[in-house]
Structure formats: C-alpha cells, structure tokens
Amino acid sequence: EQFFVDSKPIEVCRVARGKRCKMGRAGNFSQAPDFGFCASQNTYYFGYKLHALCGLSGVIHSYDLSKASVADLHYMKDVKHTYHDCSIYGDKGYIGADVQLDLFETAHIRLECPYRLNQKDWKPTFIPFAKARKRIETIFSQLTDQFLVIRNYAKITNGLFARIIGKISALTILQYVNFINDKPIGRIKYALN
C-alpha cells in the first residue's frame, strides 16, 4: 500500500495574543497550544499542527493534532505502531535517516522524501511521486476552503479537537457519498447534488 503524509497549521489566535490565550492553560499542559513556524507559508503562528495520512484514493486513514512546535517527523513514531509493510511519501519536513531506518526495521515502512538540493547523494524527485503527493495537498485545501478548518472559535482545547474531528468526518462522509454514487471521490463540493 502507498500513503501520503503531511501537516497543516491550525492557528488558535494571532501571534501577538499568544501569551494571553487561555486555551489549554487550565488543565493538561501537554495539550496546550504553542508557537510554531510554517515553512510553506513562511509565517509564525500560535496553535496546533494537524498531521494527516491519506491513501492514493484521497481518503484520510489517520490524523493527529500536536503542538505547533513539534517537528513533523515526530508523527511518524505514532504511525509505526499502526501501519506496517507499506510505503509512505512525505515532503522535505520528514527527512531523517535515523527515523527512516527505524520505521523500516520495526514495521517495514519505507518513508520516501524528496532530497534537499544541498543534501549528499542528491537525486532528482521522481515525477509520478510528486504528482501523486498533490492528493493530500488537495485534501488540506478542501478542508480549508469548504470546511473552514483554519477558522475556529473554540474556547477550550477539547472543543477545538471536537470541531477538527467533525470537519474531517464530514469530508470522509462526502467522499463516501461520491463513492456510492460512482462519482469521483475528490469532488466533494458537488457530492450532494
């Protein structure tokens, strides 16, 4: 099987209000939001990071929310307990030889990432891999545009987590409606027409 992994920033409030934000401060500090940096948008933000793993068809198989300051590579430690004997394709945020070796030795998971230009043993990116990876980017775009996943008015951490889970569930239901009606799974905007 082949899967694609990526992450998306979920902003809780603006960076200037980050120190005054009360979300996650009352209870478990391990779930409190944190400051992070999004390399693709070249911005700092205060909140969480949504990690998702999807298949070739575009259905999300696994997801997790972590603090914004946590590196993308840490999500792969959770994946190795759930999946085995598969290939996972990620972006440059998932480069790490020790993690790739650990995933392969423990669960026979091949983690494929494009090389950085200044990396030793550089090889060009395999074009079909780059085209297929657009699937998870499309899912994140659909979550942002049609389900407004980045706009959240939750006051507590559990409320935010529940809203994110609800939006991912709604996306999956619309994909299933398209599957039943023999329509392309990715066209969720017109699923109920």
Where are these regions (language model features)?
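Charge-dense polyanion-binding interfaces
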Residues: 27-35, 162-171
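Polybasic low-complexity intrinsically disordered regions
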Residues: 1-92, 96-105
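Helix-centered, glycine/charged polyanion-binding patches within enzymatic domains
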Residues: 87, 92-158
